[in-house]
A protein has these predicted regions:
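Conserved alpha/beta-hydrolase "acid-adjacent" motif
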Residues: 236-242
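Alpha/beta-hydrolase fold nucleophile elbow
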Residues: 142-153
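Alpha/beta-hydrolase active-site loop
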Residues: 120-140
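Conserved alpha/beta-hydrolase
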Residues: 97-117
Length: 296
Protein backbone atom coordinates (compact mmCIF):
# COMPACT_ATOMS: atom_id res chain seq x y z
CA UNK A 1 0.00 0.00 0.00
CA UNK A 2 2.82 2.37 0.80
CA UNK A 3 4.27 1.84 -2.65
CA UNK A 4 0.88 2.56 -4.19
CA UNK A 5 0.53 5.79 -2.25
CA UNK A 6 4.00 6.89 -3.36
CA UNK A 7 3.30 6.24 -7.03
CA UNK A 8 -0.02 8.05 -6.84
CA UNK A 9 1.72 11.09 -5.40
CA UNK A 10 4.51 10.94 -7.95
CA UNK A 11 2.16 11.43 -10.88
CA UNK A 12 0.85 14.87 -9.86
CA UNK A 13 4.36 15.93 -8.83
CA UNK A 14 5.65 15.02 -12.29
CA UNK A 15 2.75 16.79 -13.94
CA UNK A 16 3.31 19.86 -11.76
CA UNK A 17 7.01 19.87 -12.61
CA UNK A 18 6.14 19.73 -16.29
CA UNK A 19 3.66 22.59 -16.02
CA UNK A 20 6.10 24.75 -14.07
CA UNK A 21 8.95 24.16 -16.50
CA UNK A 22 6.78 24.71 -19.57
CA UNK A 23 5.62 27.99 -18.05
CA UNK A 24 9.22 28.97 -17.36
CA UNK A 25 10.31 28.15 -20.88
CA UNK A 26 7.31 29.84 -22.45
CA UNK A 27 8.39 32.95 -20.55
CA UNK A 28 12.05 32.20 -21.18
CA UNK A 29 13.19 35.41 -19.49
CA UNK A 30 12.39 33.97 -16.06
CA UNK A 31 14.26 30.79 -16.96
CA UNK A 32 17.54 32.63 -17.64
CA UNK A 33 17.52 35.58 -15.22
CA UNK A 34 17.81 35.41 -11.43
CA UNK A 35 18.50 38.97 -10.29
CA UNK A 36 18.90 40.21 -6.75
CA UNK A 37 17.99 43.79 -5.88
CA UNK A 38 19.99 43.83 -2.65
CA UNK A 39 23.67 44.71 -2.62
CA UNK A 40 25.80 42.50 -0.40
CA UNK A 41 28.78 43.61 1.73
CA UNK A 42 31.98 42.63 -0.01
CA UNK A 43 35.43 43.04 1.57
CA UNK A 44 37.02 42.67 -1.87
CA UNK A 45 35.96 46.26 -2.52
CA UNK A 46 38.19 47.55 0.26
CA UNK A 47 41.29 47.21 -1.90
CA UNK A 48 40.11 49.20 -4.92
CA UNK A 49 38.68 52.66 -5.58
CA UNK A 50 35.20 52.71 -7.11
CA UNK A 51 32.43 55.08 -8.03
CA UNK A 52 28.86 54.76 -9.24
CA UNK A 53 28.02 54.98 -12.91
CA UNK A 54 24.59 55.26 -14.52
CA UNK A 55 23.60 54.31 -18.05
CA UNK A 56 20.39 55.33 -19.81
CA UNK A 57 19.19 52.80 -22.39
CA UNK A 58 17.44 53.80 -25.64
CA UNK A 59 14.10 52.71 -24.16
CA UNK A 60 14.60 54.92 -21.11
CA UNK A 61 15.71 52.43 -18.45
CA UNK A 62 18.35 53.70 -16.02
CA UNK A 63 21.04 51.14 -15.29
CA UNK A 64 23.43 51.29 -12.37
CA UNK A 65 26.98 50.07 -12.18
CA UNK A 66 30.43 50.73 -10.83
CA UNK A 67 33.74 51.93 -12.18
CA UNK A 68 36.77 50.37 -10.51
CA UNK A 69 39.76 52.66 -10.81
CA UNK A 70 43.38 51.49 -10.78
CA UNK A 71 46.23 53.32 -9.15
CA UNK A 72 47.89 55.50 -11.74
CA UNK A 73 47.12 55.82 -15.43
CA UNK A 74 44.87 52.98 -16.64
CA UNK A 75 46.33 50.44 -19.04
CA UNK A 76 42.92 50.40 -20.69
CA UNK A 77 39.21 50.08 -19.94
CA UNK A 78 37.38 46.77 -19.60
CA UNK A 79 33.59 46.51 -19.67
CA UNK A 80 32.48 43.50 -17.60
CA UNK A 81 29.15 41.76 -18.29
CA UNK A 82 28.27 39.39 -15.47
CA UNK A 83 26.29 36.17 -15.14
CA UNK A 84 22.59 35.57 -14.66
CA UNK A 85 22.26 35.78 -10.86
CA UNK A 86 22.66 38.37 -8.09
CA UNK A 87 24.29 41.68 -9.17
CA UNK A 88 27.53 43.65 -9.37
CA UNK A 89 28.07 43.51 -5.61
CA UNK A 90 28.95 39.81 -5.84
CA UNK A 91 30.22 39.55 -9.41
CA UNK A 92 32.82 42.22 -8.72
CA UNK A 93 34.92 39.44 -7.18
CA UNK A 94 35.58 38.19 -10.70
CA UNK A 95 37.29 41.39 -11.84
CA UNK A 96 38.87 43.18 -8.87
CA UNK A 97 42.18 41.62 -9.90
CA UNK A 98 41.98 43.44 -13.24
CA UNK A 99 41.75 46.80 -11.47
CA UNK A 100 44.68 45.83 -9.26
CA UNK A 101 46.59 44.94 -12.43
CA UNK A 102 46.11 48.48 -13.76
CA UNK A 103 42.85 48.45 -15.74
CA UNK A 104 39.80 50.64 -15.35
CA UNK A 105 36.89 48.19 -15.00
CA UNK A 106 33.28 49.14 -15.73
CA UNK A 107 30.55 46.85 -14.36
CA UNK A 108 26.92 47.51 -15.26
CA UNK A 109 23.90 45.67 -13.87
CA UNK A 110 21.29 44.62 -16.39
CA UNK A 111 17.76 45.94 -15.95
CA UNK A 112 16.12 44.40 -12.89
CA UNK A 113 19.46 43.67 -11.22
CA UNK A 114 20.75 45.55 -8.19
CA UNK A 115 19.99 49.26 -8.41
CA UNK A 116 19.09 49.16 -12.10
CA UNK A 117 15.52 49.95 -13.02
CA UNK A 118 13.09 47.73 -14.90
CA UNK A 119 12.69 43.99 -15.24
CA UNK A 120 15.10 41.60 -16.93
CA UNK A 121 13.96 40.39 -20.34
CA UNK A 122 15.82 38.67 -23.14
CA UNK A 123 15.63 41.66 -25.47
CA UNK A 124 16.21 44.12 -22.65
CA UNK A 125 19.38 42.54 -21.29
CA UNK A 126 20.99 42.47 -24.74
CA UNK A 127 19.97 46.09 -25.31
CA UNK A 128 21.53 46.94 -21.94
CA UNK A 129 24.86 45.48 -23.03
CA UNK A 130 24.85 47.58 -26.19
CA UNK A 131 24.02 50.67 -24.12
CA UNK A 132 26.85 49.83 -21.71
CA UNK A 133 29.33 49.72 -24.58
CA UNK A 134 28.01 53.08 -25.79
CA UNK A 135 28.48 54.52 -22.30
CA UNK A 136 32.10 53.36 -22.07
CA UNK A 137 32.95 55.11 -25.32
CA UNK A 138 31.22 58.26 -24.05
CA UNK A 139 33.08 58.37 -20.71
CA UNK A 140 35.53 61.17 -20.05
CA UNK A 141 39.11 60.03 -19.68
CA UNK A 142 38.66 56.71 -21.49
CA UNK A 143 41.22 56.00 -24.18
CA UNK A 144 38.85 54.94 -26.95
CA UNK A 145 41.59 52.89 -28.59
CA UNK A 146 42.15 50.78 -25.48
CA UNK A 147 38.73 49.26 -24.73
CA UNK A 148 38.00 45.57 -24.16
CA UNK A 149 34.90 43.58 -23.17
CA UNK A 150 34.81 40.65 -20.74
CA UNK A 151 31.74 38.45 -20.24
CA UNK A 152 31.16 35.53 -17.87
CA UNK A 153 28.54 32.80 -18.24
CA UNK A 154 25.34 34.52 -19.42
CA UNK A 155 27.41 37.68 -19.70
CA UNK A 156 29.73 35.92 -22.13
CA UNK A 157 26.80 35.05 -24.37
CA UNK A 158 25.48 38.61 -24.12
CA UNK A 159 28.95 40.06 -24.78
CA UNK A 160 29.31 38.11 -28.03
CA UNK A 161 26.02 39.50 -29.33
CA UNK A 162 26.81 43.02 -28.12
CA UNK A 163 30.30 43.23 -29.60
CA UNK A 164 29.11 41.77 -32.91
CA UNK A 165 26.35 44.39 -33.14
CA UNK A 166 27.93 47.44 -31.53
CA UNK A 167 28.53 50.51 -33.69
CA UNK A 168 31.85 50.75 -31.82
CA UNK A 169 33.06 47.31 -32.89
CA UNK A 170 35.86 48.75 -34.99
CA UNK A 171 37.32 50.33 -31.83
CA UNK A 172 36.85 47.41 -29.43
CA UNK A 173 40.30 45.83 -29.14
CA UNK A 174 39.54 42.55 -27.37
CA UNK A 175 36.77 40.25 -26.16
CA UNK A 176 37.25 37.69 -23.37
CA UNK A 177 34.49 35.10 -22.91
CA UNK A 178 34.48 32.87 -19.83
CA UNK A 179 32.16 29.88 -19.28
CA UNK A 180 29.60 30.94 -21.88
CA UNK A 181 27.01 28.66 -23.45
CA UNK A 182 26.85 28.42 -27.23
CA UNK A 183 23.10 28.86 -27.57
CA UNK A 184 20.06 29.71 -25.46
CA UNK A 185 18.00 26.93 -26.98
CA UNK A 186 20.87 24.46 -26.69
CA UNK A 187 21.51 25.07 -22.99
CA UNK A 188 17.75 24.96 -22.32
CA UNK A 189 17.56 21.59 -24.08
CA UNK A 190 20.40 20.26 -21.93
CA UNK A 191 18.87 21.49 -18.68
CA UNK A 192 15.42 20.12 -19.54
CA UNK A 193 17.09 16.79 -20.32
CA UNK A 194 18.38 16.65 -16.74
CA UNK A 195 14.78 16.37 -15.48
CA UNK A 196 13.77 12.73 -15.87
CA UNK A 197 10.04 13.33 -16.43
CA UNK A 198 10.80 15.78 -19.24
CA UNK A 199 13.80 14.16 -20.90
CA UNK A 200 11.79 12.84 -23.85
CA UNK A 201 10.36 16.31 -24.45
CA UNK A 202 13.58 18.33 -24.22
CA UNK A 203 13.73 19.16 -27.94
CA UNK A 204 10.14 20.45 -28.37
CA UNK A 205 10.25 22.26 -25.02
CA UNK A 206 13.54 23.96 -25.85
CA UNK A 207 11.97 25.39 -29.00
CA UNK A 208 9.95 27.66 -26.75
CA UNK A 209 13.24 29.51 -26.11
CA UNK A 210 14.31 32.10 -28.65
CA UNK A 211 17.63 31.60 -30.41
CA UNK A 212 17.71 35.13 -31.78
CA UNK A 213 20.51 36.21 -29.46
CA UNK A 214 22.41 32.92 -29.30
CA UNK A 215 26.19 33.44 -29.43
CA UNK A 216 26.62 30.65 -31.97
CA UNK A 217 24.77 32.85 -34.46
CA UNK A 218 26.85 35.95 -33.75
CA UNK A 219 30.36 34.90 -32.80
CA UNK A 220 31.43 34.72 -36.44
CA UNK A 221 30.68 38.44 -36.71
CA UNK A 222 32.90 39.47 -33.80
CA UNK A 223 35.96 39.56 -36.09
CA UNK A 224 38.24 41.39 -36.49
CA UNK A 225 38.05 41.87 -32.71
CA UNK A 226 40.44 39.32 -31.12
CA UNK A 227 38.52 36.86 -28.94
CA UNK A 228 39.84 34.74 -26.08
CA UNK A 229 37.50 31.92 -25.02
CA UNK A 230 38.10 30.45 -21.56
CA UNK A 231 36.29 27.44 -20.11
CA UNK A 232 36.90 25.07 -17.21
CA UNK A 233 37.03 21.39 -18.04
CA UNK A 234 35.18 20.64 -14.78
CA UNK A 235 32.29 23.00 -15.55
CA UNK A 236 29.07 21.14 -14.76
CA UNK A 237 26.80 24.14 -15.29
CA UNK A 238 27.89 24.88 -18.85
CA UNK A 239 29.97 21.96 -20.15
CA UNK A 240 33.24 22.85 -21.90
CA UNK A 241 31.85 21.55 -25.20
CA UNK A 242 30.05 24.90 -25.41
CA UNK A 243 33.34 26.80 -25.30
CA UNK A 244 34.86 24.48 -27.87
CA UNK A 245 31.85 24.97 -30.14
CA UNK A 246 32.13 28.74 -29.88
CA UNK A 247 35.82 28.58 -30.68
CA UNK A 248 35.12 26.46 -33.77
CA UNK A 249 32.53 28.98 -34.97
CA UNK A 250 34.63 32.08 -34.26
CA UNK A 251 36.65 33.73 -37.00
CA UNK A 252 40.30 34.63 -36.58
CA UNK A 253 41.88 36.10 -34.55
CA UNK A 254 40.85 33.74 -31.76
CA UNK A 255 42.29 31.87 -28.79
CA UNK A 256 40.98 29.05 -26.61
CA UNK A 257 42.01 27.82 -23.18
CA UNK A 258 40.29 24.87 -21.52
CA UNK A 259 41.42 25.14 -17.90
CA UNK A 260 42.09 21.82 -16.13
CA UNK A 261 40.10 21.35 -12.93
CA UNK A 262 38.21 24.64 -13.16
CA UNK A 263 34.47 24.69 -12.57
CA UNK A 264 31.94 27.25 -13.74
CA UNK A 265 33.47 30.78 -13.79
CA UNK A 266 36.38 29.51 -11.68
CA UNK A 267 39.15 29.81 -14.26
CA UNK A 268 40.29 33.25 -13.10
CA UNK A 269 40.99 31.91 -9.61
CA UNK A 270 44.22 30.56 -11.08
CA UNK A 271 47.16 33.01 -11.06
CA UNK A 272 48.46 31.34 -14.22
CA UNK A 273 45.15 31.92 -15.99
CA UNK A 274 45.07 35.54 -14.88
CA UNK A 275 48.55 35.98 -16.29
CA UNK A 276 47.43 34.58 -19.65
CA UNK A 277 44.47 36.94 -19.78
CA UNK A 278 46.70 39.89 -18.91
CA UNK A 279 49.11 38.94 -21.69
CA UNK A 280 46.23 38.72 -24.14
CA UNK A 281 44.88 42.11 -23.09
CA UNK A 282 48.30 43.76 -23.16
CA UNK A 283 48.90 42.45 -26.66
CA UNK A 284 45.46 43.35 -28.00
CA UNK A 285 45.28 46.80 -26.43
CA UNK A 286 48.81 47.85 -27.29
CA UNK A 287 49.96 46.29 -30.55
CA UNK A 288 46.52 45.25 -31.89
CA UNK A 289 48.29 42.21 -33.28
CA UNK A 290 46.14 39.29 -34.44
CA UNK A 291 46.68 36.27 -32.23
CA UNK A 292 45.07 33.32 -34.05
CA UNK A 293 46.49 30.63 -31.81
CA UNK A 294 45.14 28.11 -29.34
CA UNK A 295 46.53 27.93 -25.84
CA UNK A 296 47.16 24.51 -24.30
Amino acid sequence: MAGTRTSRRAVPVAVLASIVLIAALAGCDSYFFYPSKDHFPNPALDCVAREDVFVRTPDGVRLHGWVLRPKGEPLGTILFLHGNAENVSTHVNSVVWLALAGYRVVLVDYRGYGKSEGKATMAGVHADALAAIDSVFAMDGVDKDRVAVLGQSLGGAVAIYAVANSPHKDRIRALVVDSAFSGYREIAREKVGEISVLKLFRSPLSRLVTDRYSPSLWIGRVAPVPIFIVHGDADRVVPPAHGERLYALAAEPKMLCIVPGAGHIQAFASPAMRARVLRFLADALSTKRHLGTELP
